């Protein structure tokens, strides 16, 4: 008696059914530069007009163990937003406009409804970012993942005029450091967060915590902010006064802000200049987790940092506000001399 691919654990019909659903989800994300529909061997996207020296900008990332929260809660339609955010926000830091996005979804046994929910989130993230979902890969890998689990990876490409690339080289001592609010943990630090909440505090994802304003799962699954519209507004309002942008991800402020600062420069930040979101307070008390560990693990409520000329700080904050983002003066750029990377962010 013959053996089939389905009996070996790969259901081609389920994969085809998911592709048809993905086509419908991707269609509303299409931009004028896209030249082909989802479903071919390759996605096609033309460079936008009006650029004399267009430079392509790429970024790739995943969602990490935030996926464990999706598995535990059965909520799968937000981690796709996180996936787009993690890739697109990196591309945005050099001043690029996001063009297109591709995803990789891998699972042991394909559940078409779960796959559709994940891609629905990806499509929503692409809409927020103004980029097109032009393709991806769905891999059914029997025996590679536990039942009901999957992994995600994403890849974003944007474009920027060569002369408008933000590389941080013009940052100078005295420049203002503008903090832009995160929505919570975003997509980093979840291994520590889950350890504190589940092991140290004995909570489940369905438990309600007054300080969180809902369940543990709801607080943790809050989607990562996508700053595409905000950065477009910032650049329009402030132009060359924008000196650099930093996406605050794993490593927190000390691990990310120095990546855009020239040698010899650091930043003095005032963490008392804003209200730290409740989720971080719950985690710090619940561990307990030392402040230094909090700073190098979580974004602490700051999802993006913009470095601008001091005189442009008010304009920058206003531009962020008009695009729906909360922003404030978090600190300033200072001279620090020859110090280790991790010591270039000072907290005062």
From Swiss-Prot:
GO terms for biological process: 'de novo' IMP biosynthetic process; adenine biosynthetic process. Its EC number is 6.3.3.1. The keyword Kinase does not apply. It comes from the Bacteria. The keyword Transmembrane does not apply. Keywords: ATP-binding, Cytoplasm, Ligase, Nucleotide-binding, Purine biosynthesis. Belongs to the AIR synthase family. HAMAP family: AIRS. This is Phosphoribosylformylglycinamidine cyclo-ligase. It comes from Sorangium cellulosum (strain So ce56) (Polyangium cellulosum (strain So ce56)).
């Amino acid at each position: 008696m013959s053996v089939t691919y389905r009996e070996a654990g790969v259901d081609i019909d389920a994969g085809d059914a998911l592709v048809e659903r993905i086509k419908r989800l991707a269609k509303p994300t299409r931009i004028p530069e896209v030249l082909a529909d989802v479903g071919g061997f390759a996605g096609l996207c033309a460079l936008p007009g009006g650029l004399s020296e267009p430079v392509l900008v790429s970024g790739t990332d995943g969602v990490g163990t935030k996926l464990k929260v999706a598995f535990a809660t059965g909520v799968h339609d937000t981690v796709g937003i996180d996936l787009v955010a993690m890739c697109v926000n990196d591309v945005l830091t050099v001043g690029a406009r996001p063009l297109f996005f591709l995803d990789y979804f891998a699972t042991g046994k394909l559940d078409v409804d779960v796959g559709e929910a994940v891609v629905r989130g990806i499509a929503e993230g692409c809409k927020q970012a103004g980029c097109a979902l032009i393709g991806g890969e769905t891999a059914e890998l029997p025996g590679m993942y536990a039942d009901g689990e999957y992994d995600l990876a994403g890849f974003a490409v944007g474009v920027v005029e060569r002369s408008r690339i933000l590389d941080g080289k013009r940052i100078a001592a005295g420049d203002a450091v503008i903090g832009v609010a995160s929505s919570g943990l975003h997509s980093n630090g979840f291994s520590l967060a889950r350890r504190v909440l589940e092991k140290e505090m004995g909570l489940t994802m369905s438990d309600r915590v007054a300080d969180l304003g809902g369940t543990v799962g709801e607080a943790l699954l809050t989607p990562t902010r996508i700053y595409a519209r905000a950065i477009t507004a910032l650049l329009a309002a402030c132009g060359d006064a924008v000196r650099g942008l930093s996406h605050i991800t794993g490593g927190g402020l000390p691990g990310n802000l120095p990546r855009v600062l020239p040698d010899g420069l650091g930043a003095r930040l005032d963490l008392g200049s804003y209200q730290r979101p409740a989720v971080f307070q719950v985690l710090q008390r619940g561990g307990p987790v030392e402040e230094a560990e909090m700073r190098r693990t979580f974004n602490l409520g700051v999802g993006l940092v913009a470095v601008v000329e001091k005189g442009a700080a008010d304009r920058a904050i206003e531009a962020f506000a008009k695009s729906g983002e909360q922003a404030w003066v978090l600190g300033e750029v200072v001279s620090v001399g020859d110090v280790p990377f991790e010591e270039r962010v000072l907290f005062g």
